[in-house]
A protein has these predicted regions:
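Conserved Rossmann-fold NAD(P)-dependent oxidoreductase catalytic core, especially the SDR/UDP-sugar
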Residues: 122-175
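Conserved glycine-rich Rossmann-like NAD(P)H-binding loop of the short-chain dehydrogenase/reductase
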Residues: 49-62
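SDR active-site strand-loop-helix element
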Residues: 31, 56, 95-101, 141-147
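Active-site Tyr-X1-5-Lys
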Residues: 155, 171-193
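N-terminal Rossmann NAD(P)H-binding glycine-rich loop of SDR-like oxidoreductase domains
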Residues: 21, 25-48
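Conserved catalytic-core motifs of eukaryotic protein kinase domains, centered on the activation segment
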Residues: 65-67, 105-112, 152-159
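Conserved internal alpha-helix in NAD(P)-dependent oxidoreductase domains
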Residues: 93, 111, 115-122, 139, ...
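NAD(P)H-binding glycine-rich loop region in Rossmannoid oxidoreductase-like domains
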Residues: 70-71, 77-116
Length: 193
């Protein structure tokens, strides 16, 4: 038996039950839940009656947000092993991947921005793909876009362009925008493989 199939069998065996030996509960998983979009998303899902929200962030979520979730964890999307362990505890149907180093910080620390924005996204996409293969059911990854993926060389060009289509002017001018656009393409790649 190859080492890859051995690893997949071991992961499948450990993923079929949660960390306490209980069957995995269905869950919607949110990375970067402590940000503005994360708070809004958790609130909207909770108001919609969802009780299966599992949220992660680098910092502890506030009490109100924690009460709307079925589980909250301190976790770093760059830590692939930690993400695999967390995701294996649940039967994840959807992942809202919101964790990111945003524009200003990514400009001052481009390597950190790349590590989190690209490396963390690859971790999430690969884990979702692995779980989809193991259980024969795709895991949907929702990765919101950003205006930062677009770019114009001048204000005049921007004014002249008017309404911009989804696939026009994809010339980001910030590290964050470059990371986001690249990760959108990674998402397309993983969706097709």
């Amino acid at each position: 038996m190859s080492s890859k199939s051995t690893k997949e069998e071991a992961m499948k065996s450990s993923m079929s039950e949660g960390s306490l030996g209980h069957p995995r509960q269905p869950a919607v998983f949110i990375t970067g839940a402590g940000g503005e979009v994360g708070h809004g998303l958790i609130s909207a899902l909770h108001l919609d009656g969802r009780e299966d929200i599992v949220a992660t962030d680098l910092r502890e979520l506030d009490q109100t947000t924690r009460e709307m979730c079925g589980g909250t964890y301190l976790a770093d999307v760059c830590d692939r092993d930690a993400m695999e362990r967390l995701l294996s505890m649940y039967q994840v149907t959807e992942i809202f991947h919101l964790a990111a180093v945003l524009s200003s910080r990514a400009e001052f620390a481009p390597e950190v921005g790349h590590q989190v924005n690209v490396g963390g996204t690859i971790n999430i996409l690969q884990i979702a793909a692995d779980q989809g293969r193991m259980y024969g059911k795709p895991v949907k990854v929702i990765f919101p876009s950003s205006i930062a993926t677009y770019g114009f060389s001048t204000i005049r060009q921007k004014m002249k362009a008017g309404a911009v289509g989804e696939h026009e002017f994809l010339k980001p001018r910030t590290m964050y925008g470059c990371n986001k656009l690249y990760c959108e393409n990674l998402g397309r790649y993983y969706a097709c493989s």
